[in-house]
């Protein structure tokens, strides 16, 4: 499933085609994705101007001139693809209609924005912009890891006394929004923390020290266009490249990249997810 860097990359890719532009026509090709699409969705979108595109955790929100916001969740295999007239650098020569093109937005200026989702685990909804943060998908989310509200004091306070593994704590969207399995594995490696270590055992300084590492990993991943492992593509159809710089994720049995370390990357399963780590470097 796309994590924060992938969703932010898609948001940035959509911006030239959508931000400030009118939706001249919307087409909905099926009534549901993961859940039923909102009633009269095509009618409610057509003629609306996109005021801005923003991201909350792993969700994209397009704020519309009529007072509603289009909430987009890519799910496991969803893609937002831009085709048609060249708008900025994010244009993909995407034939229409393709089999899994479920929602199509014809934009002012000639660009076409298509939501394509072969597995239909993605979702779309229309919500009042002023109440978007109360939507069930957003209401319980913690602060953004790249935002000002997420700092060392906050994270140290949230981890103090927690008797869950530090990996599980960082994946808890109520503590910090948008982190997923890939990037938490990479963060814990850089921090030298074993994924099974109890969050409450870190102490204030080590817990607070996770914040700059989280920011560093996410920023590097966004700069690389995210990580393409299976279905993820940028809005122009290109792959992300951060997977080529993974230090532990997906590297089971390979040598640790830490200079002087003779350990091999291991894999354990926590709550149904693979945790990649170096048993020598991470304690």
From Swiss-Prot:
The keyword Lipid metabolism does not apply. Binds 1 zinc ion per subunit. One of its GO terms (biological process) is base-excision repair. DNA binds at residues 100, 119, 162. GO terms for molecular function: 8-oxo-7,8-dihydroguanine DNA N-glycosylase activity; class I DNA-(apurinic or apyrimidinic site) endonuclease activity; damaged DNA binding; zinc ion binding. A zinc finger (FPG-type) spans 247-283. This is Formamidopyrimidine-DNA glycosylase. The gene is mutM.
């Amino acid at each position: 499933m796309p994590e924060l860097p992938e969703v932010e990359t898609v948001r940035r890719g959509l911006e030239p085609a959508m931000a400030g532009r009118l939706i001249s026509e919307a087409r909905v090709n099926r009534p549901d994705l993961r859940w039923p699409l909102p009633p009269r969705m095509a009618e409610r979108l057509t003629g609306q101007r996109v005021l801005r595109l923003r991201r909350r955790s792993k969700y994209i929100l397009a704020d519309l001139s009529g007072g509603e916001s289009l909430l987009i969740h890519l799910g496991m295999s969803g893609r937002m693809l831009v085709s048609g007239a060249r708008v900025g650098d994010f244009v993909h020569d995407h034939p229409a209609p393709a089999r899994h093109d479920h929602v199509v937005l014809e934009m002012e200026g000639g660009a076409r924005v298509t939501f394509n989702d072969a597995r239909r685990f993605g979702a779309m909804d229309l919500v009042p912009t002023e109440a978007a943060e109360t939507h069930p998908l957003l209401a319980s989310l913690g602060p953004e890891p790249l935002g000002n509200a997420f700092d060392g004091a906050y994270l140290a306070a949230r981890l103090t006394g927690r008797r869950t593994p530090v990996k599980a704590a960082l994946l808890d969207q109520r503590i910090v929004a948008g982190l997923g399995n890939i990037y938490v594995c990479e963060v814990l490696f850089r921090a030298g923390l074993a994924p099974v270590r109890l969050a409450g055992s870190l102490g204030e300084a080590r817990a607070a020290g996770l914040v700059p590492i989280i920011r560093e990993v996410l920023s590097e991943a966004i700069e690389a266009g995210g990580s393409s492992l299976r279905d993820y593509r940028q809005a122009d159809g290109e792959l992300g490249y951060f997977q080529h710089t993974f230090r532990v994720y997906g590297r089971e049995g390979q040598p640790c990249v830490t200079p002087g370390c003779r350990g091999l990357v291991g894999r354990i399963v926590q709550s149904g997810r693979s945790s990649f780590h170096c048993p020598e470097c991470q304690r």
